[in-house]
Amino acid sequence: KKALVECDGDMDKAVEWLREKGLAKAAKKAGRIAAEGMSYALTENGVGVVVEVNCETDFCAKSDLFVAFVKDIAKVIAEQNPADVDALMNCKYVGSELTVSETMPEKVMSIGENLQIRRFVRFAENTSVGYVHAGGKIGVLVNLAVEGGIDATEIGKNVAMQIAALNPRFWDKSQVTDEVLAEEKKIALALMDTDPKMASKPDAVKEKIVMGKMNKF
């Protein structure tokens, strides 16, 4: 009603007036910090996606509107294969001729908080298995190369759960750099020096203990 009054009863102008007001409000929300959100994993038609989308509050992160938005973004990534978040913003939104970027202001208004698509990973080869922990606080996507038609779903799920629990920095020892090993060794020696039982031990003994720890790292 207010829009019609402002536009002298012109319906088309009223719609445009409302749209402009909505975009202005969305722009104001865009400056607010989006530190909450959720991760979502999607696997379909041989493609695996995990995406993180942020909002402002935990309450919003659990809302049906926000969850539906995150799922739509995952579907866009799976179907249109954008290279990065910038490219994703130029993709067509699900069931629309508008791009993700053009759709964002309306989503910000309907959901009521600033929204940010933080990051994503997409695999289109081998077998992808997704796992989401703690209601979307942690999202993992594992991509496995299998032979002989083996169903790797259960293995992939177990690996994904381990990753969610332990947050490993590397897949195997070959990926661990000398710099990382040197830093871990330095930390281990420093911790030993703070332990009265270990601090008095000879350096050679400390070195041997640390090397044992490094083999387990």
What are these regions (language model features)?
Residues 1-217:
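N-terminal assembly/interaction segments in proteins that build large macromolecular machines
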